[in-house]
């Protein structure tokens, strides 16, 4: 890595040069850097806003799942069968599904070799269990912190190799002409002097491992400190794909954590209260006829954690809806593990068979919810205690939260975007569709970063592309001028951020009304047009929020436009999104009219929505999914090609 200075328009920046810049220090980013080094590419630089932040290191659940090819037991499995499982999630490209299946075992076993303690039996089989949307038993876990342990082991591998890292650098512009990437402009959030404020990175390749656009939503289970940077990639000319497809689910507010699995299966008391904590009510019983019916649905919510519009009528997702509606009334909703629901006036024998049999086999038909939780999953209790929440003493506030973006930046089967040299890996990339088995995101992050590294090492070595200087000069002048204009005695950027995130949660999350989306879309467009005039920061330390807000608004604009386009093309409710449709039906008469909807019939599952953000407008294209490839697998042919090219490209 070479370092010097670059000046333009009265602004100066440090300049670093390298072949490949890896943006992000989650599991996907670290794996990309580690794989590049293993493959012989040593001119690498890792760039991160905060090494200890991010979703991989700071998120999880009661039993965080990693999805892999079956490596135990008598049941048959194959790369092709796993690819078909992934492909069946709708709006999934088959070549990507095949890659995620083909490299699954390799990626998983690398993590094992690095020290991630995935459980195996005495004979060496890596045992598994069945997760949602999983026809086999491909899921495995090391407990609540699977992705954290992955990240820490990969980080140790990277540090052992001495791969350089620049911490406290926030990417604020991707240097691109819409066809080729030339580098990055970053804000040094630790700089004390204006002359040290900006850092330019000239590189031939960018591995973009920035995670999903978490900052768009106020109601979010993404860890505090993770914001994403999808908007910057869209601005640079990268296509978005499946932007409408998300996962939302119930999560605690402080700390941010999925309340899935045993958190629901132990049947906590669910109640709401006024803002000041008064007027407690077990509001679910206003809807359900009997405690047994309510508790059976609550139990299933543990198994079926993501909000699924197919499970609103007669299923467990009615719990998500009722929590959402209660919060819309201005009330706060809590899980209470101290006391049994309905004053204990229920019988385990009256629960639906799945709930009754599970709790009986677990020996958990006794005591209070926290006692049941301690019996069934003691680490789940310890997690909250470590965060300052004692479930034996404190209620847990929850909300319906954004959890994962199945869509994102469009990629090919090497995880390269339509902008040459820009690779998107991890949640930043759009490798998933409407539905996916639990844990596939962790597998996809490892596979995608491996594929990107393989392509870069084989095809994109050498010096950076020509064209950097004009792109860098323009970006430095524009972003430098923005900093000077926004620094004012009174700052409003934090308030604008909070307002925008709240509006997105109100109209662009799990419950989507076309009219409300159109109204907020126009507001976002106006905010972007007046951004330089209306956004202010009271001190240099707030500039990070200025650039963050800019990225967030671009993301919101693109995602809202995608939702509106989906509806205009006749799209119906599917996955984790309920689209209000007056032509539909309400599953329950007592629900508000906003819950009148039509279920998608799956006929659009073979088409993908792609979007190009150009000159402040979104251009949409719908195309057929790419099928699962059926390549020649005759050994001698593959072997010959492998000897000649490594079968890369």
Q: Where do the protein language model's features map onto the residues?
A:
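N-terminal Rossmann-like FAD-binding beta1-loop-alpha1 element of flavoenzymes
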Residues: 18-46
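Conserved N-terminal glycine-rich FAD pyrophosphate-binding loop of Rossmann-like flavoproteins
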Residues: 49-84, 247-251, 257-266
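Glycine-rich loop(s) and the adjacent beta-strand/alpha-helix scaffold that form part
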Residues: 205-258, 439-455
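Core beta-strand elements of the Rossmann-like FAD/NAD(P) dinucleotide-binding domain
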Residues: 15-18, 194-205, 418
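Short hydrophobic core segments
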Residues: 21-23, 200-211, 233, 423-424
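An anion/pyrophosphate-binding glycine-rich loop and adjacent beta-alpha core
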Residues: 239-382, 455
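Glycine- and aromatic-enriched mobile tails/lids
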Residues: 1-19, 32-35, 51-59, 110, ...
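Conserved redox-cofactor binding core of oxidoreductases
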Residues: 107-194, 202, 209, 252-263, ...
